Amino acid sequence: MSEEKIFEGDRAGHALREFEFGRRLGLQALGVMVASGAVATLADVSAAQAAAKSGTIKIGYVSPRTGALADFAGPDAFVLALIKKSSYFLKGIKIGGTTYHIEITEKDTQSQPNVAVQVTQELINSGVDLVLTSSAPETVIPVATTCEQYKVPCVSTVVPWEAWWGGFTGASISPQGGAAGTGPTYNSMFFYGVPHFVGCFVPMWEKIQKKVNCNTNVAEMFPNDSDGNAFRAAFAPTVGAIYPNGGYNFVDGGAYTDLTTDYSAMIQTFKTGGKNGAACDLFVNVPLPPDFQTFWTQASQQDYNPKLATVAKVMLFPTDAYALGDLSNNVATDSWFTPYSPYKSSLTGQSAYNFAAAYQTAGHGQWVQSMGSTYSLFEIAIQALKAVKNPHNRLELASALQVVNYDGMCGPINMNLKSANPFLASPAKGIGMIQPFGVQWKPGSADLVGHRKYAWSQWIVDNSLNPHIPLNGTLEPTNV
């Protein structure tokens, strides 16, 4: 089938619901700006910018250092310390005959959208030239929309592009699931979107079906929240649009409430609710991490053992695997950074492997995938700064960010790629797509990164969307 098929039919429903989630967060951010009384007027912002030292480029970095999303920001201190030691940040960057020093100010959102707005306001009032932000819609969208409101360049990551796009006034989703309407002027982002989750998970389903006796019944554990309702509405239709011959039968476990403590009824549905009363051998979800831990423990106790579990939003970090212990074995998820990629820093030439090894050797614990995306934010900033004549001209800098095209720690990132392949193409100017790959949690440490051994590691078992990532593990049935 043609690659364009991915954008046909009901896939748009999922994109639209991610968009609406972003829209709500964007409106909430605007409400905080209006109600707080702390937001600067445009005149105040201009005055703060004029007061900034002409020889200093000020960058703000916003992430959830504390709170429910803190795992995403776990490597921040290490990554930023490394960034500050690189040549451009240590010695300055020469633009138009002037050498500018770069100053980084870090802010913690406490994993709260209203705090994200407030700390972004503080950065704007201090006269930052650029804001970088990472990790989940609850962080990224309030930051990005605040920057757009006050014409401050901003780059975001680790958020589905559909949700990010939905935060901006004038943006919309087309009937085919693409970007439509008027997008932001001062914002850019890189990550991936709804089709990439499907393109990451289904190839693993197909592999396991060839390996063991596995039916096509798919258990859906989708909560009654923004992410869960979006997946419930369109994950199955999206699979059908991309893989029309898959024959998958989806069994919805019900729109449960977040932080539910008893999943017995859902488990029974998954054990007997498939075709001809069969169990669901495949499993997909998008829950809160504690809910997956509770469900997965109870499922094991009640003898529900799917042949392959492919999970979104959870099992992204080592802490998730350690919380489940042996029940983590061969649980699969999507990943966007690994030490085993061929990619390297555009700032220093350091390989992804040595980057992760340095993190572990320095005693920061086990490497995590968010370290790669955080690093790339600063690479992108430098790429844009090298392209402008005046780093304090916000419109010029924002425009340069929207056409960045380079290779770095997360691989090739092109913010304005025209391609017939919808997995690769930019949905709109200023949106760069990176390609995830399938991993499973397995005992041990692949190749002992940094000579540190850990009990559980992500092993790369499928690279259908990103063949540049080498496999270092074999896809195996979950919990077998």
Say what each PLM segment does.
Residues T169, V194-P195, A299-Y375, A387-V388, ...:
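Extracellular/periplasmic periplasmic-binding protein-like sensory domains
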